[in-house]
Amino acid sequence: MFTSKANAIFQDVINTYHLINTVDQGFTNVYDETSNLIEHLLYRKCWIDTVQWHYEDIIRDPQIDPVAALTLKRKIDASNQDRTDMVEYIDGYFLNKYAHVTPKSSAKINSESPAWAIDRLSILALKIYHMNEEVERKDASESHIAACQTKLNVLLEQRVDLSTAIDDLLEDIENGDKYMKVYKQMKMYNDDELNPVLRGQK
């Protein structure tokens, strides 16, 4: 199943990031873009998510320097754009993969594209990793650990359900029971023609 591969890649990315555990570390994609395109895209996608997860931790530091916070906010904006771009690349992969499929006359569209569901699966992998860290903390109270274990159990169940839904969606598309229709994300805040503040500075 597709999500078995995706979940394994996400876990590998998150484990690799935490070997050094800094947002400034270099990135190396272990999958070749030519011979392993979808693996390459999934690996890059989860790396972007993982770095941004830690950006979001840092910017919530109440003692953060305001200048550093502004710099970090712009990094988060850029990361969000990279994340969106990667989702669109992944959807492009599936559009190409299933281009030969003729949808049935009864085919329906899904509420989200495969790649946006995969985006949620990547974020879910990060939630599971960090919730598990809380469960394994030696300095935490028993009540904290118990509460986090309950949350972890829900997250693990959610991953099973989301993985099943994604695999079912891909199967439905392959069989012509559903069809893909992808909309470009109309990001406005980084566009100097659409953001009135940026437009006023031109």
Model-flagged regions — what are they?
Residues 1-202:
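Anionic, Ser/Thr-rich low-complexity intrinsically disordered regions
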